Amino acid sequence: MLRTMFHAKIHRATVTQADLHYVGSVTVDQDLLDAADILPGELVSIVDVTNGARLETYTIAGERGSGVLGINGAAAHLVHPGDIVILIAYGQMDDDEARHFQPKVVHVDADNRIVELGIDPADGLLDGLSRPPLSREWNEAQAEL
């Protein structure tokens, strides 16, 4: 049996643009996609922390280092510039892999710059709180990419 498991998330990113007339998808800074191990074209769920909307779409690589997170197409009715969102990707794994897999958690600041990489799906890094024990400092994790 294959299990569908959380494999990556970009946590609390800020939507930088929305284009209702684009054909669809979400445009994400290539640096964020790389850090989360999410491929262009990969299915992602978007959870809008600001208004509670949830949707599924696919990713398009945005300009590296730009901080872009653009909502495209009909989803622009639900998610707006300035909204805080979580992008979640899932993967199918056999039972053994699912029990031992460590996902990638990418924490970003208000400008969508990476501030922390982690492996704990329950990480909820918020300003002013200490780092969760399973997360790693950015420089240490970056060296492994």
From Swiss-Prot:
It holds the Pfam family Asp_decarbox. Keywords: Autocatalytic cleavage, Cytoplasm, Decarboxylase, Lyase, Pantothenate biosynthesis, Pyruvate, Schiff base, Zymogen. Substrate binds at residues 57, 73-75. Is synthesized initially as an inactive proenzyme, which is activated by self-cleavage at a specific serine bond to produce a beta-subunit with a hydroxyl group at its C-terminus and an alpha-subunit with a pyruvoyl group at its N-terminus. It comes from the Bacteria. It is found in: Cytoplasm. The keyword Transmembrane helix does not apply. Heterooctamer of four alpha and four beta subunits. This is Aspartate 1-decarboxylase. The gene is panD.
